[in-house]
């Protein structure tokens, strides 16, 4: 019997050994450094958020609750990026695959298209999304692929090692201040002509298109929360390797049928 492709079976063995024997470096010694593996493994969560539609569902609920004006929508999309960023190390997948389509659909709903009508809302929303992603990408170590590589270089050069929670604590104040200012400054600069948004209708249409929440979305919520918890635990002197946590999370998305190996390769 071969219930899963060979690469997934191999990774399952790697994950089991890493967790049970705490020998992540030894297990991955032939596969470059652990930082690269963490990035690759956590990328599966980025793919899962896009494939399941969970990212879009979260977005439409935020739009329904808070997006009654263009300025509020700026904050909604910024904080959507913030919510997704701890579990999506690909800021391209996060911004272009989840946040951008939401901004685009809202802009089109108010008749804002590239060209003469861009100033209605589209120019502001898309610019705001771009700059918000730049901030969320450094707020968490797992929010952008190069972050853990940078940590690896810092550790090798200085001997200073930061875990996931320490990185987040160091970046929180400057990051949060910037995230609060970006939508407002962008709004003052772009001055969108459309001020009020029919957010209830936009959200209702979007959620209707997505349909009821699927089992894969519920499973992804559990996996993402457990992964983030695993990355935080070393702060409390609980020895668990961040790379091992990421690999287990990736394996869980495969085993639960949330994504396939081909989805990850794409």
Region roles according to the model:
Residues 76-77, 128, 170, 248:
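Hydrophobic core positions of alpha-helical segments in small-molecule transporters
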Residues 4-114, 262-266:
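Membrane-embedded alpha-helical segments and adjacent helix-loop junctions characteristic
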Residues 71-78, 122, 126, 216-225:
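Short hydrophobic alpha-helical membrane-embedded segments
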Residues 1-4, 80-90, 130-141, 230-236:
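Transmembrane alpha-helix interface/packing and boundary motifs in multi-pass membrane proteins
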Residues 51-54, 91-95, 110-212:
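Juxtamembrane and boundary regions of transmembrane helices in multi-pass small-molecule transporters
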């Amino acid at each position: 019997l071969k219930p899963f492709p060979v690469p997934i079976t191999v990774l399952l063995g790697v994950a089991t050994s890493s967790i049970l024997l705490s020998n992540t470096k030894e297990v991955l010694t032939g596969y470059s450094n652990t930082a690269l593996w963490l990035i690759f493994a956590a990328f599966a969560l980025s793919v899962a958020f896009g494939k399941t539609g969970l990212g879009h569902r979260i977005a439409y609920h935020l739009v329904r609750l808070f997006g009654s004006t263009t300025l509020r929508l700026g904050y909604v999309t910024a904080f959507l990026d913030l919510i997704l960023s701890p579990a999506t190390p690909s800021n391209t997948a996060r911004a272009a695959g989840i946040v951008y389509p939401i901004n685009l659909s809202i802009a089109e709903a108010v008749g804002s298209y590239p060209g003469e009508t861009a100033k209605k809302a589209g120019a502001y929303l898309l610019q705001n999304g771009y700059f918000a992603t730049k901030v969320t990408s450094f707020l968490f170590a797992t929010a952008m692929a190069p972050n853990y590589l940078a940590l690896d270089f810092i550790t090798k050069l200085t001997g200073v090692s930061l875990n996931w929670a320490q990185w987040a604590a160091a970046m929180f104040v400057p990051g949060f201040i910037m995230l609060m200012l970006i939508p407002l400054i962008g709004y003052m600069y772009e001055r969108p002509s459309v001020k009020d948004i029919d957010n209830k209708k936009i959200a209702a249409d979007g959620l209707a298109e997505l349909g009821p929440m699927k089992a894969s979305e519920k499973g992804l919520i559990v996996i993402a929360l457990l992964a983030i918890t695993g990355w935080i635990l070393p702060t409390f002197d609980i020895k668990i390797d961040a790379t091992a946590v990421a690999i287990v999370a990736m394996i869980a998305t495969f085993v639960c049928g949330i994504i396939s190996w081909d989805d990850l390769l794409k």
